[in-house]
Amino acid sequence: MTNIRKTHPLLKIVNNAFIDLPAPSNISSWWNFGSLLGICLILQILTGLFLAMHYTADTTTAFSSVTHICRDVNYGWIIRYMHANGASMFFICLFMHVGRGLYYGSYTYMETWNIGVILLFATMATAFMGYVLPWGQMSFWGATVITNLLSAIPYIGTNLVEWIWGGFSVDKATLTRFFAFHFIFPFIIAALAMVHLLFLHETGSNNPTGISSDADKIPFHPYYTIKDILGALLLILALMTLVLFSPDLLGDPDNYTPANPLSTPPHIKPEWYFLFAYAILRSIPNKLGGVLALVLSILILILMPLLHTSKQRSMMFRPISQCLFWILVADLLTLTWIGGQPVEHPYIIIGQLASIMYFLLILVLMPVASTIENNLLKW
């Protein structure tokens, strides 16, 4: 009799995706981040669900309800901090996952890559709306500043912003709708992640060499299930270390002050994982130009398959491209640092140079380097 996992309509799907899936024999730990993102998403949905049981999406009680969760609810403090720091772990895994895709040329799987970019946008939107919910000073002013960027859109901008706010400023209506969206979005992300996997399994995984691995496949289980479990344990270790030893390390002290529309914090800044984009936004003196640069800084990922000029898929055997890739990583770290600094000399000029460097590397230097490498190989 055939094994039930190969015949049952539901189990067959699970089997083909996680058990008998043919996987390349040489994929490294950089391929662990997909499963880690899945774990992060499940963790965020579960902790978020329990937080939503005690949270009230109303301007008068939102801040108090979060305090109540931390003080009075059984293990509420750990659920709250796991959710807040879980978002940070989520973005660390996201950046690693995207970086892996860029380095090893995974973006040549167009459908998988484009859905991944949509997933990145959806996750960023979800995290932004979640940051508004505790209704602290940085929640309120972050929401005001970021939503206000849409007013830079010609003709419809002001109407659009007021439509999103549900009034003439960030208020009760804004908080309520942000809570509704923050609740529904993770499920949309989960659905998109399944489509992401569906398209990936049409082609099979890429591998570090960028060469077809059809001649050398191994079953996903037990080899990569055990590898993913190790990755998951390390992720949980890192998360719980953060939660139990320094839960506020990545947060903003201003968010422990209840939202006050009459008092602006001296430095309005988003969570650390948005700082690189915030630095690019601030580096352009023009409002519309800044907003366009902000959107393009992420949207540029969609162009990666078009900018690929190399005859090799992966950067594994391309030293010039490798150097440029790590310069890009350093540049993004520089932008992250600048995004958290006040708008004054020398930070302004450093931010502007780093922003120019970011677009220059992706749009010009890396495609040129690939062409040079092609010629060096005399192919």
From Swiss-Prot:
UniProt keyword Iron, yes or no: yes
Binding site for a ubiquinone: H201
Keywords assigned: Electron transport, Heme, Iron, Membrane, Metal-binding, Mitochondrion, Mitochondrion inner membrane, Respiratory chain, Transmembrane, Transmembrane helix, Transport, Ubiquinone
Presence of keyword Iron: yes
Tree of life domain: Eukaryota
Compartment(s) where it occurs, according to its Swiss-Prot or TrEMBL record: Mitochondrion inner membrane
UniProt lineage: Eukaryota, Metazoa, Chordata, Craniata, Vertebrata
UniProt cross-references to Pfam families, sorted A to Z: Cytochrom_B_C (PF00032), Cytochrome_B (PF00033)
UniProt xrefs under CDD domains: cytochrome_b_C (cd00290), Cytochrome_b_N (cd00284)
Protein known as: Cytochrome b
Protein family: Belongs to the cytochrome b family.
This protein's GO CC annotations: mitochondrial inner membrane; respiratory chain complex III
Cofactor binding mode and count: Binds 2 heme b groups non-covalently.
Membrane topology: Multi-pass membrane protein
Cofactor: heme b
Function, as annotated: Component of the ubiquinol-cytochrome c reductase complex (complex III or cytochrome b-c1 complex) that is part of the mitochondrial respiratory chain. The b-c1 complex mediates electron transfer from ubiquinol to cytochrome c. Contributes to the generation of a proton gradient across the mitochondrial membrane that is then used for ATP synthesis.
Note: Heme 1 (or BL or b562) is low-potential and absorbs at about 562 nm, and heme 2 (or BH or b566) is high-potential and absorbs at about 566 nm.
UniProt-annotated binding residues for heme b b562: H83, H182
Positions of heme b b566 binding: H97, H196
GO molecular function, one term: ubiquinol-cytochrome-c reductase activity
Species: Cephalophula zebra (Zebra duiker)
InterPro entries: Cyt_b/b6_C, Cyt_b/b6_C_sf, Cyt_b/b6_N, Cytb/b6-like_sf, Cytochrome_b, Cytochrome_b_C_euk/bac, Cytochrome_b_N_euk/bac, Di-haem_cyt_TM
Gene Ontology BP terms: mitochondrial electron transport, ubiquinol to cytochrome c
Subunit structure, interactors included: The cytochrome bc1 complex contains 11 subunits: 3 respiratory subunits (MT-CYB, CYC1 and UQCRFS1), 2 core proteins (UQCRC1 and UQCRC2) and 6 low-molecular weight proteins (UQCRH/QCR6, UQCRB/QCR7, UQCRQ/QCR8, UQCR10/QCR9, UQCR11/QCR10 and a cleavage product of UQCRFS1). This cytochrome bc1 complex then forms a dimer.
Main location class: mitochondrion
